Amino acid sequence: YKRKMHANYCSLSSKDFDKTLRETLPLETQSLGTRVKNFDSSSVTLADGERLEAGAVIDCRNIIASKHLEGGWQIFVGRHFKYKKPHGIKNPIIMDASVTQHAPSGNRSAYRFMYVLPLADDELFFEDTYYDEERALDENLLKYRIDQYNQQIGLEEGTEISREKGILPVITGGDFKAYLSSFEKQGVAMAGARGGFNHPLTSFTMPFAVSNALAIAGKANL
């Protein structure tokens, strides 16, 4: 079964996002590679002992494993290739589920698909994605499966520019209120994945992060 979607598809590379933020934000607002030691409703203490005072603190960290949540995992490896000649793929392939439907670990059945994004006439981004109950990522096997897929669709071997990988939680049930109460601090607002601001199926957070950032910048008393 094939279906062509007549809609726009937007994608943002980590490299471009990082570059734009560094160029746009004042240098004094950037704190890179810095770990937070502690925080409360009006301050954040960094690992090096520096204390940042603030009118408000928002916890936007990643989601954490909890006995209060139920679900599985979205597991993926993505690879960005450059080819010696144009690849000929004009539109994104959003979800090719014609690939084998199994997880690498234990050879269990799992919902798996490949997606392909044409980033330039001679560049493609491939991602091998599957949903599984086990939190296990075999990077080398997924890398190999992407190489196989390249051959299957008739492409010559390309040069890998970059690679990414991830294991994202897919929450299907549980007691979210109990989950939040297990770590939230009085007076500290919650956002990001830890606060549940993520898509229920993909676990992606970017659209929610943008909406929250605009709302905070536009209305908060900073």
Model-inferred region functions:
Residues V116, D121-E123, F183-L201:
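Short FAD-binding loop at a beta-strand-to-alpha-helix junction that anchors the flavin cofactor
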Residues Y1-S41:
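A conserved beta-strand/loop capping segment in the N-terminal third of enzymes
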Residues T24-E160, I171-Y179:
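Predominantly flavin-linked oxidoreductase catalytic cores and closely associated redox partners
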Residues K2, Y131-E133, G195-N198:
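A short, flexible beta-alpha/helix-coil linker loop
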Residues L214-L222:
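C-terminal helical "tail/cap" subdomain of flavin- and related membrane-associated enzymes
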Residues R194-A215:
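A conserved FAD-binding loop/helix module that cradles the flavin
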Residues H6-A7, A136-E139, L201-F204:
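Short, solvent-exposed loop/turn segments at secondary-structure boundaries
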